[in-house]
């Protein structure tokens, strides 16, 4: 009961690129779906890596269910993100040139991985997501983001992600020395809007 490592690629090859964008899809989505979003981002010179969740979902239940109820899939999903990062590092890409983009379940997974492995990255965009668990276990989160730019966009209300968890996540990342911008859109629905793409480009992919 674990994810098979299956990384889809697009953009520049790892050999050519100096920067890498890791894109994490949402529940029921696919690596190809989220890679197609890259055409709207300022990432023409990046290598794009998108791991595919086995069975289309990173973990079975809500991200605010008790953590043990999402195991062993959750730990395997976090490990998959780590292996995707290692793929970039092994190609000679520095961590400060590795970027992240996640939507919904993929945003939650991206944020959970980053908070557990804080260091200076290129930047991160998380649309409708927060750190994972029914309660936030602050002991899991260590490191220093060294002012890594992070953009959190969400809708309020959102059926899957309470806005309170987005704010709590922003506060944790700020405590860990990330440069966080959060933007809440009233009644926008569970999707990515045009302004979020523009903000992602101006804050992170600049």
Task: Please give the residue ranges for each predicted region.
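Serine-hydrolase catalytic machinery in alpha/beta-hydrolase-like enzymes
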Residues: 2-97
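Short alpha-helix in the alpha/beta-hydrolase fold that links the catalytic acid
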Residues: 34-37, 138, 162-172
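Active-site signature of alpha/beta-hydrolase-fold catalytic machinery across serine-
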Residues: 36, 112-116
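A conserved short beta-strand
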Residues: 119-132
């Amino acid at each position: 009961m674990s994810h098979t490592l299956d990384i889809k690629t697009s953009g520049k090859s790892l050999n050519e690129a100096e920067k890498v964008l890791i894109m994490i899809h949402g529940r029921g989505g696919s690596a190809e779906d989220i890679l197609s979003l890259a055409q709207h981002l300022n990432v023409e010179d990046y290598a794009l890596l998108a791991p595919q969740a086995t069975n289309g979902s990173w973990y079975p239940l809500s991200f605010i269910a008790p953590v043990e109820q999402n195991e062993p899939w959750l730990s395997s999903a976090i490990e998959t993100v780590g292996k995707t990062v290692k793929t970039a590092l092994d190609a000679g890409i520095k961590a400060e040139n590795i970027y992240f983009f996640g939507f919904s379940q993929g945003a939650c997974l991206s944020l959970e991985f980053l908070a557990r492995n804080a260091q200076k990255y290129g930047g991160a965009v998380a649309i409708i997501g927060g750190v994972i668990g029914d309660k936030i276990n602050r002991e899991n989160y260590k490191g220093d983001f060294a002012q890594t730019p992070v953009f959190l966009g969400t809708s309020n209300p959102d059926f899957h992600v309470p806005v309170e968890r987005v704010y709590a996540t922003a506060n944790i990342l700020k405590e860990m020395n990330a440069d966080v911008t959060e933007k809440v859109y009233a009644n926008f629905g569970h999707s990515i809007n045009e302004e979020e793409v523009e903000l992602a480009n101006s804050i992170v992919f600049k």
